[in-house]
Amino acid sequence: PPPPPQGTRHLMSHEPAEHGKVLQRMPIELRWRDLDAFNHVNNSNFMTYLEEARIRWFESLGEEWVTDATAPLLAAVQMNYRQPIPYPGSIVVELTADRVGTSSVTLGHRITSADGTVLHADGHVVMVWIDRGSGRPTPLPAAVRRVAGG
């Protein structure tokens, strides 16, 4: 077969991504509505699972992570789909702190089977905190920085 297009080697890699400090492990029970015509979880639901894990992690901080003046935005998403998620079943979403910057945090993610033996997806998201008035980046909330290790 021809070689992959230049610059796509990492994206097409079958090797799981390296991740940092574990922030959250959230079990999720699959729902019938998550399925597609192929009788496995639709790929768009993977993003919903990640969103739910991020929000639960933010809420677990015990301090403000969003205010009237500042809020996080999803700036980038990278998802490697490794194996379909069959129904019925359960999964675990794991979030990790991969990088902590001045106004952003890169959160690694893994979606595995409940017993951790099957990796369904991995990758990362970049969250940037902005000033709601100006739309410009603003420093990370202290709780996010402290817990994520920055």
Regions found by a protein language model. Give the residues of each.
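HotDog/MaoC-like acyl-thioester-processing domains
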Residues: 12-26, 81-87, 98-150
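Short linear sequence elements within intrinsically disordered, low-complexity coil regions
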Residues: 43, 51-54, 86, 92, ...
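Hot-dog-fold acyl-thioester-processing enzymes
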Residues: 13-76, 131-150
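Hydrophobic beta-strand-centered segment that forms part of the acyl-chain substrate-binding groove
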Residues: 57-105, 120-121
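Short, Lys/Arg-enriched N-terminal segments with co-localized hydrophobic residues
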Residues: 1-11
